Amino acid sequence: MNIDKIFENPSNLRSFEFNNDVCKVFDDMVSRSVPGYHNIQDIISLTYDEFSQNRVFIDVGCSTGTTIAKILSENQVNYCYGIDISESMLAIAQEKCGEHESLVTFKNCNLLNGTDNVINSEKVPDFIILNLVLQFIRPPERKKFITNIKSLCSSSTLMLVFEKIIFNDAEINMKYIDSYLKWKGKNGYSESEVSNKRKALENKLIPYLHEENIELFKSSGFNSVEICFSFLNFRGYLCRC
C-alpha cells in the first residue's frame, strides 16, 4: 500500500480533488483519516448480508473498490455496480475486483447528470452504499443525488450512509474537531500535514448536522432512519423505505 505523503509538501496547498496522486495513496489516506474505517467496512458487509434480498448492490462513490471487493469475498452476490467520477479510482477498483469481474460493472459517471444506462434492468439493486460521499456533494444538490440513486433501485431499497457531521453546540463541535485532529496525529500525520489538508478541504467537504442528514434521508423517501455507527464526528445511517 502506498503511503499518503501528499500534504507534507506546502506546494500541494490547492483545493482538494480526487486526482491521480490522491488515488495512488487513497487506501492509506482513508484508513488513517476516518475513525473506525475498517469497522465501517465490516458494518457494510454484514448489513448487506442481512438485508439484501436481490443480492444486488450499488456502491456510489466506490473509489478504489475496497468495499465492493470485501462484500464479494465475504457474501453471496448476484451482481453489483461501482460508480465513481474518477477514472483513476475505477482503474484501481477494477484491478482489485478482477477475480469477480463477471459480477461487477464499474461506471465512470456523475449521477447528478442523469441515470440512463447505469444499471441492467434485469439486475436491479436493493442495497445502496454511500460511504463518505454526500459531504462532497453541494448541499442544494444532495436530495437530487439521493433521489437519482434511489430511482435505480427496487422499491424495498435499503441505503447505508456514512458521513462526517457537525454539532449544534459550538463548543462541543470545536472539541470534537480538536479530538479528531489529535486522532489523525496518532495515525502518523504531522501537524503541518493535518493543517494543509484541512485548508485544501475548505468548501470541498461540507458536513451536515446530524438532524439535517435525518431530514434529508426522510425527505428523499426513506421512512426509517437509524444510527448504525458513531465515532467522534462521524456517523453511520441505516435508511429503509
From Swiss-Prot:
Its EC number is 2.1.3.-. GO terms for biological process: tRNA wobble uridine modification. It comes from the Bacteria. Keywords: S-adenosyl-L-methionine, Transferase. CDD domains: AdoMet_MTases. S-adenosyl-L-methionine binds at Y37, G61, C62, S63, N131, R198. GO terms for molecular function: carboxyl- or carbamoyltransferase activity; S-adenosyl-L-methionine binding. SUPFAM superfamilies: S-adenosyl-L-methionine-dependent methyltransferases (SSF53335). It catalyses: prephenate + S-adenosyl-L-methionine = carboxy-S-adenosyl-L-methionine + 3-phenylpyruvate + H2O. Signal peptide: none annotated. The keyword S-adenosyl-L-methionine applies. Homodimer. Belongs to the class I-like SAM-binding methyltransferase superfamily. Cx-SAM synthase family. Catalyzes the conversion of S-adenosyl-L-methionine (SAM) to carboxy-S-adenosyl-L-methionine (Cx-SAM). This is Carboxy-S-adenosyl-L-methionine synthase 1. It comes from Yersinia pseudotuberculosis serotype IB (strain PB1/+). The gene is cmoA1.
